[in-house]
């Protein structure tokens, strides 16, 4: 009985269902067609059977060449994006490595200061000036702001990029202003006195400020102590107490430094003459406005220099 059961189990079924027969025929037909196509393609016959579902241009050599060129271009763009990403990551690692050189306490203090700048919103100018007066602004603060700016650029956060870029420039300007020479500090003050409208009134105020800052260039004024009015012959004649540092700014020193600054700026202008903003896209318009602002500042510095050269007390 067991042997009979084994024979019946291993034998093929006597009756197959219509569904099984149909599937078997379809599979056999597809295999035969695929085999025929493969054989024809390998034999190199001109009457090659087109693959079902493929567009006619698939067999066009020119179309294939164009597709290969597109593929090469896409791969090139992909490589450039990967290289740019690697460059940004390398910059971030470099900044992170540089931050490790500073003590942990200084890092926490600088990060706290930068966070206070970001939270200050409209009062950020006062907060930066207050920090500068306390001597809290240094290279470490700039590096932390740049670190955050780099992260925002990687994440393409446009609002954060704009805010952090302005914050970086403002802090950098304040640091440079504190480290500047007396002549550059005076020049910065004179430029900030301009309200943007009245040039004549601004030049008049500049002349008055220069006359008060520069010592008079005559023998009697040089011999007299500070505070003595040479015109009215009034004031103390006691010699001034000598100090370790003399912050007196001479007109000749101011003229020399401002003229050197102008020469340097003009050289940079000549080097960037060909990169003028053209077109109506946002970047070109921003570049054009920046160049106009720079030219206006140069003209103001030239006016200040001419005023200092011809200053009369």
From Swiss-Prot:
Tissues in which the UniProt entry reports expression: Expressed in green tissues, including leaves. Accumulates in chloroplasts of mature stomatal guard cells.
Record-linked InterPro entries: PALE_CRESS
Biological process, per Gene Ontology: cellular response to light stimulus; chloroplast mRNA processing; chloroplast organization; leaf morphogenesis; ribosome biogenesis; RNA metabolic process
Induction: By light.
GO CC annotations on file: amyloplast; chloroplast; chloroplast nucleoid; chloroplast stroma; chromoplast; etioplast; proplastid
Alphabetized GO MF terms: RNA binding; rRNA binding
Domain of life: Eukaryota
Subcellular location: Plastid, Chloroplast; Plastid, Chromoplast; Plastid, Etioplast; Plastid, Amyloplast
Transit peptide per record: 1-22
UniProt KW keywords: Amyloplast, Chloroplast, Developmental protein, mRNA processing, Plastid, Transcription, Transcription regulation, Transit peptide
Function summary: Required for the differentiation of chloroplast from proplastids or etioplasts, probably by modulating some chloroplast-encoded genes expression and mRNA maturation. Involved in leaf-cells differentiation.
Designated name of the protein: Protein PALE CRESS, chloroplastic
Organism ancestry: Eukaryota, Viridiplantae, Streptophyta, Embryophyta, Tracheophyta
């Amino acid at each position: 009985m067991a042997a009979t059961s084994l024979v019946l189990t291993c034998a093929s079924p006597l009756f197959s269902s219509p569904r099984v027969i149909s599937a078997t025929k379809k599979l056999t037909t597809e295999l035969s067609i695929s085999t025929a196509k493969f054989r024809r393609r390998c034999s190199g016959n001109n009457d090659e059977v087109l693959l079902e579902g493929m567009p006619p241009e698939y067999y066009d050599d020119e179309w294939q060449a164009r597709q290969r060129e597109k593929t090469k271009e896409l791969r090139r763009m992909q490589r450039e994006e990967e290289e740019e990403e690697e460059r940004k990551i390398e910059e971030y690692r470099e900044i992170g490595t540089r931050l490790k050189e500073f003590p942990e306490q200084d890092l926490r203090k600088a990060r706290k200061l930068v966070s206070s700048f970001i939270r200050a919103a409209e009062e950020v100018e006062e907060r930066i000036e207050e920090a500068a007066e306390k001597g809290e602004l240094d290279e470490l603060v700039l590096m932390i702001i740049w670190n955050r700016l780099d992260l925002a650029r990687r994440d393409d956060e446009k609002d954060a990029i704009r805010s952090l870029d302005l914050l970086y420039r403002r802090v950098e300007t304040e640091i440079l202003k504190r480290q500047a020479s007396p002549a550059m500090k005076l020049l910065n003050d004179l430029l900030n006195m301009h309200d943007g409208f009245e040039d004549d009134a601004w030049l008049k105020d500049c002349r008055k400020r220069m006359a008060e800052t520069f010592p008079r260039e005559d023998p009697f004024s040089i011999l007299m102590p500070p505070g003595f009015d040479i015109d009215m012959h009034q004031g103390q004649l006691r010699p001034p107490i000598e100090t370790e540092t003399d912050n007196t700014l001479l007109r000749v020193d101011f003229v020399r430094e401002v003229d050197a600054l102008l020469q340097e700026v003009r050289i940079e202008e000549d080097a960037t003459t060909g990169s003028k903003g053209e077109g109506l896209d946002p970047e070109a318009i921003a570049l054009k406005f920046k160049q106009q602002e720079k030219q206006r500042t140069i003209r103001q510095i030239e006016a200040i220099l001419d005023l200092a050269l011809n200053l009369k007390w």
